[in-house]
């Protein structure tokens, strides 16, 4: 499971020494695997305590960046706790789900997806 945390990356000072940047995905690092694709979506979502994003898959590279809370991420049968500052890469067609670690607290994420060149339109409301 590809999970990257700002806690594991040293910031690089950019913009004339005024802005620390934590590169969770280095420039062009995913060029080959996303080549020919397009930006499918950008969203923000919250899974309430006791909630669950049911297992599902998409023909996209999907990325979740945790902005608040903690959750249990499962991708293709591998389970890992994720928390604020983590970036999760979900490969195309990988079965995945997410739930908060407790029934009393939510997890809040920023999400974006890059579709593969041959991907059909996706109806996200069905998931």
Model-derived regions, located:
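A short beta-strand-loop-beta hairpin characteristic of the jelly-roll/cupin
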Residues: 52, 56-84, 94
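A structure-centric signal for secondary-structure junctions around beta-strands
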Residues: 39-41, 60, 106-107
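Short, charged/polar surface micro-motifs in flexible loops or helix N-caps
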Residues: 39, 47-50, 70, 115-118
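Short glycine/proline-enriched turns and hinge-like loops at secondary-structure junctions
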Residues: 36-37, 57-58, 102-103
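A short, N-terminal "cap"/entry segment at the start of jelly-roll beta-barrel domains
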Residues: 1-38, 123-127
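Conserved hydrophobic/aromatic beta-strand scaffold that supports enzyme active sites
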Residues: 23, 42-46, 63, 79, ...
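Ligand-binding loop in jelly-roll beta-barrel domains
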Residues: 83-84, 92-119
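Conserved short histidine dyad/triad with adjacent acidic residue
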Residues: 25-31, 42-58, 92
């Amino acid at each position: 499971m590809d999970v990257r945390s700002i806690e594991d990356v040293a910031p690089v000072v950019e913009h004339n020494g005024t802005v620390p940047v934590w590169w969770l995905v280095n420039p062009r690092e995913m060029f080959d695997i996303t080549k020919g694709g397009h930006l499918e979506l950008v969203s923000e979502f919250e899974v309430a305590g006791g909630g669950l994003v049911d297992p599902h898959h998409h023909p996209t590279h999907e990325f979740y960046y945790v902005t608040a809370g903690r959750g249990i991420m499962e991708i293709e049968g591998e389970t890992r706790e994720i928390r604020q500052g983590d970036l999760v890469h979900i490969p195309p067609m990988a079965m995945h789900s997410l739930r908060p670690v407790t029934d009393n607290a939510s997890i809040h994420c920023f999400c974006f997806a890059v579709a593969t060149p041959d991907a059909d339109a996706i109806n996200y409301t069905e998931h």
